[in-house]
Amino acid sequence: MRQGIHPEYHHDTVVKCACGNTFTTGSVKPELKVEICSKCHPFFTGKQKIVDVGGRVDKFNKRFNLNK
């Protein structure tokens, strides 16, 4: 490997989630902020989050006159 071109690796990077969970990992950044982690992700918690896309569907149907 060439010297001087690789970023500094931090073995104790703190990852902070929006839900309040924190954990450490390795990264080239000293601190990471994430919106979702294994403590709050629906796949790991078993809870479903419903994403509201009804407005987009209605807008599409209205634009192309697909109302029945």
Swiss-Prot record:
GO terms for molecular function: metal ion binding; rRNA binding; structural constituent of ribosome. NCBIfam families: L31, PRK00019.1, PRK00528.1. GO terms for biological process: translation. GO terms for cellular component: ribonucleoprotein complex; ribosome. Zn(2+) binds at residues 17, 19, 37, 40. Pfam families: Ribosomal_L31 (PF01197). Belongs to the bacterial ribosomal protein bL31 family. Type A subfamily. Binds 1 zinc ion per subunit. It comes from Clostridium perfringens (strain 13 / Type A). Binds the 23S rRNA. Keywords: Metal-binding, Ribonucleoprotein, Ribosomal protein, RNA-binding, rRNA-binding, Zinc. Disulfide bonds: none annotated. SUPFAM superfamilies: L28p-like. HAMAP family: Ribosomal_bL31_1. Part of the 50S ribosomal subunit. This is Large ribosomal subunit protein bL31. Its cofactor is Zn(2+). It comes from the Bacteria.
